[in-house]
Amino acid sequence: MSTIPVTIDFSGGAEFLVKAKAQKVQIPADSTLRDVLKFVRDNLVTDVHRINMLLNDDASEVAHGVITLINDTDTGLLLEYDTVIEAGDTITFVSTLHGG
């Protein structure tokens, strides 16, 4: 199976749930954003007790309050979870939830 290089970036508090704020990883070629969510769950999340702050229960969607960007474009303007990821893409997860 061939793979492609991508960068996955976390901010707005989401970085506290994973190994590092920005990570260069290899994912299977032809992956969609939904596949990336599962990759994040299975390979990058370190705080499994608070994963619901980033992803829903089956990692098919991001949690409410998390904005997802591909190359700085909101995925709502693309094909959302069906967007095919390309080599060199940057996928960013931004949590908009803040305590107070």
Curated annotation (Swiss-Prot):
Family: Belongs to the URM1 family.
Protein encoded by which gene: urm-1
InterPro entries: Beta-grasp_dom_sf (IPR012675), Mopterin_synth/thiamin_S_b (IPR016155), Urm1 (IPR015221)
Processing and modification events after translation: C-terminal thiocarboxylation occurs in 2 steps, it is first acyl-adenylated (-COAMP) via the hesA/moeB/thiF part of the MOCS3 homolog, then thiocarboxylated (-COSH) via the rhodanese domain of the MOCS3 homolog.
GO MF term set: protein tag activity
CDD domains registered for this protein in UniProt: Ubl_Urm1 (cd01764)
Name this polypeptide is given: Ubiquitin-related modifier 1 homolog
Any one GO CC term of the record: cytosol
TM region positions: none
Native source organism of the sequence: Caenorhabditis elegans
Keywords assigned: Cytoplasm, Isopeptide bond, tRNA processing, Ubl conjugation pathway
Keyword tRNA processing annotated: yes
GO biological-process terms attached to the record: protein urmylation; tRNA thio-modification; tRNA wobble uridine modification
Subcellular location: Cytoplasm
Origin organism lineage: Eukaryota, Metazoa, Ecdysozoa, Nematoda, Chromadorea
Function summary: Acts as a sulfur carrier required for 2-thiolation of mcm(5)S(2)U at tRNA wobble positions of cytosolic tRNA(Lys), tRNA(Glu) and tRNA(Gln). Serves as sulfur donor in tRNA 2-thiolation reaction by being thiocarboxylated (-COSH) at its C-terminus by MOCS3. The sulfur is then transferred to tRNA to form 2-thiolation of mcm(5)S(2)U. Also acts as a ubiquitin-like protein (UBL) that is covalently conjugated via an isopeptide bond to lysine residues of target proteins.
1-thioglycine modification, residue list: G100
Keyword Cytoplasm: yes
Sequence position, cross-link Glycyl lysine isopeptide (Gly-Lys) (interchain with K-? in acceptor proteins): G100
Residues making up the signal peptide according to the UniProt record: none
Pathway(s) annotated for this protein in UniProt: tRNA modification; 5-methoxycarbonylmethyl-2-thiouridine-tRNA biosynthesis
